[in-house]
Amino acid sequence: MGSNKSKPKDASQRRRSLEPAENVHGAGGGAFPASQTPSKPASADGHRGPSAAFAPAAAEPKLFGGFNSSDTVTSPQRAGPLAGGVTTFVALYDYESRTETDLSFKKGERLQIVNNTEGDWWLAHSLSTGQTGYIPSNYVAPSDSIQAEEWYFGKITRRESERLLLNAENPRGTFLVRESETTKGAYCLSVSDFDNAKGLNVKHYKIRKLDSGGFYITSRTQFNSLQQLVAYYSKHADGLCHRLTTVCPTSKPQTQGLAKDAWEIPRESLRLEVKLGQGCFGEVWMGTWNGTTRVAIKTLKPGTMSPEAFLQEAQVMKKLRHEKLVQLYAVVSEEPIYIVTEYMSKGSLLDFLKGETGKYLRLPQLVDMAAQIASGMAYVERMNYVHRDLRAANILVGENLVCKVADFGLARLIEDNEYTARQGAKFPIKWTAPEAALYGRFTIKSDVWSFGILLTELTTKGRVPYPGMVNREVLDQVERGYRMPCPPECPESLHDLMCQCWRKEPEERPTFEYLQAFLEDYFTSTEPQYQPGENL
């Protein structure tokens, strides 16, 4: 296979078959809720897909909220840090310039890096057009490298590979190659399959490395390169569930920021187009930045929070990067404060659950959404950060049931008396752990409590927690040991997980790392006999 191929960007993109095998060696045969958005075109960047390589911009070391802003903060990557002075790269996706200083390019184009490969935006020279400008570093990979192959998805998890492959539109044999989660230096081939008993499912094959540098799935059939292995199995199943037919489609990743040095931006660069929702402290809009880029814009009412405190916190928030967190792009730091983030096409999870689509969601989809949220929060946990306002209204939904955590960290900055009293009308008491509501002790463990409440929102399709109870009553009852009963049709094992999140002593509550693992393996380890019901 040619090594200049890159991943397709959109599920709608025409899928390509693999080229014939070559030189095969070896024997062998076989806060701010957003409402459901209007039907509008998606942003140019797409909304889904594994995060790609980037190196965070250099920053002044500053400890803030337990988070060291000089740390390198990354989510699972397609390509790792670069070594060996590689300067020629190949474009993995099309990119349309957003400013006068960045560079448009097409997928497959070869680019010469002009400056060093640090930061999120690199100065590059196109070998096709002769033009020079800044490019998003996660849209390119070193020429003739494994990262430049369209089927190579890098450091994504087994569960994430299954999310991508279990699309009903994918034919049998749709595949990707990823890093092994369990064996350092090894890879995994993930392939979609179908049978009458299991329906659509995914098989995973470990690709082992020879001491000589070659690769094999079965020792009788060995290859000099991963490219040769993929090309061979595209012609011969040879023990696999099916021959490899089509590279798994995915969307372009978000760029890291809107453009080089586009952090504090002028208000005039934003156009507010469609109002998506309104909360106690502001509004949410779909809009455009610089006339080129689809974004979501939160506008805060003057007096909601101190601009100075917000800007300080935002410097930390923008370094939190994970594929299950809504990315903070830019800010307008003078009042009224504007917060510019990636746009999520399906709006808030709360509205999504209560809407038309919610009726058709069953437990497997709901548990998967919960696992995605837990994955984002496990990253927040690793970064020693605290969300403080985790609930369905602050989760955003994109295409293919992708869920991302939004509004992390903002709640701490709100200066409204009805909120800071913690028992005022604007405070989300029903989602808040007792030690946080009563004594202001907000930690990642109070976020775990809130996650347990969010699980009830998922399993009841958006019902308000503690139905029939007012805030003051909820606080009193919970302090006396009351916990919500198991929702109708919800398995006891899932209710038991909720109750673990609601343990009185914060340190006895599970970690988000545990919650993620439990939910990702739920239908294999906990409820293998699950059968769909009327609502779940």
From Swiss-Prot:
List the disulfide bonds in this chain: none
Enumerate the spans annotated as SH3 domain.
Answer: 84-145
Give the lipid-moiety residues, type N-myristoyl glycine. 2
Q: May I have one GO cellular component term?
A: cytoplasm
Top-level taxon of origin: Eukaryota
- Phosphotyrosine-modified residues are 187, 419, 530
Keywords in UniProt for this one? ATP-binding, Cell adhesion, Cell cycle, Cell junction, Cell membrane, Cytoplasm, Cytoskeleton, Disease variant, Host-virus interaction, Immunity, Kinase, Lipoprotein, Membrane, Mitochondrion, Mitochondrion inner membrane, Myristate, Nucleotide-binding, Nucleus, Phosphoprotein, Proto-oncogene, SH2 domain, SH3 domain, Transferase, Tyrosine-protein kinase, Ubl conjugation
Q: Where is the Protein kinase domain?
A: 270-523
Transmembrane residue ranges: none
Where in or outside the cell it occurs: the entry states:
Cell membrane; Mitochondrion inner membrane; Nucleus; Cytoplasm, Cytoskeleton
The entry summarizes how activity is regulated as: Phosphorylation by CSK at Tyr-530 inhibits kinase activity. Inhibitory phosphorylation at Tyr-530 is enhanced by heme. Further phosphorylation by CDK1 partially reactivates CSK-inactivated SRC and facilitates complete reactivation by protein tyrosine phosphatase PTPRC. Integrin engagement stimulates kinase activity. Phosphorylation by PTK2/FAK1 enhances kinase activity. Butein and pseudosubstrate-based peptide inhibitors like CIYKYYF act as inhibitors. Phosphorylation at Tyr-419 increases kinase activity.
* Positions annotated to bind ATP: 276-284, 298
PTM-bearing positions, type Phosphoserine:
17, 75
Domain comment, in the record's words? Answer: The SH2 and SH3 domains are important for the intramolecular and intermolecular interactions that regulate catalytic activity, localization, and substrate recruitment.
Which disease does its entry mention? SRC kinase activity has been shown to be increased in several tumor tissues and tumor cell lines such as colon carcinoma cells. Thrombocytopenia 6: A form of thrombocytopenia, a hematologic disorder defined by a decrease in the number of platelets in circulating blood, resulting in the potential for increased bleeding and decreased ability for clotting. THC6 is an autosomal dominant form. Affected individuals may also have bone abnormalities and an increased risk for myelofibrosis.
Known function: Non-receptor protein tyrosine kinase which is activated following engagement of many different classes of cellular receptors including immune response receptors, integrins and other adhesion receptors, receptor protein tyrosine kinases, G protein-coupled receptors as well as cytokine receptors. Participates in signaling pathways that control a diverse spectrum of biological activities including gene transcription, immune response, cell adhesion, cell cycle progression, apoptosis, migration, and transformation.
Say which family it is in.
Belongs to the protein kinase superfamily. Tyr protein kinase family. SRC subfamily.
PANTHER family per the record? TYROSINE-PROTEIN KINASE
Subunit record text: Part of a complex comprised of PTPRA, BCAR1, BCAR3 (via SH2 domain) and SRC; the formation of the complex is dependent on integrin mediated-tyrosine phosphorylation of PTPRA. Interacts with DDEF1/ASAP1; via the SH3 domain. Interacts with CCPG1. Identified in a complex containing FGFR4, NCAM1, CDH2, PLCG1, FRS2, SRC, SHC1, GAP43 and CTTN. Interacts with ERBB2, STAT1 and PNN. Interacts with DDR1, DDR2 and DAB2. Interacts with CDCP1, TGFB1I1 and TOM1L2. Interacts with the cytoplasmic domain of MUC1, phosphorylates it and increases binding of MUC1 with beta-catenin.
| Protein name in UniProt | Proto-oncogene tyrosine-protein kinase Src
Species whose genome carries this gene: Homo sapiens (Human)
Q: Print the organism lineage.
A: Eukaryota, Metazoa, Chordata, Craniata, Vertebrata
Gene symbol?
SRC
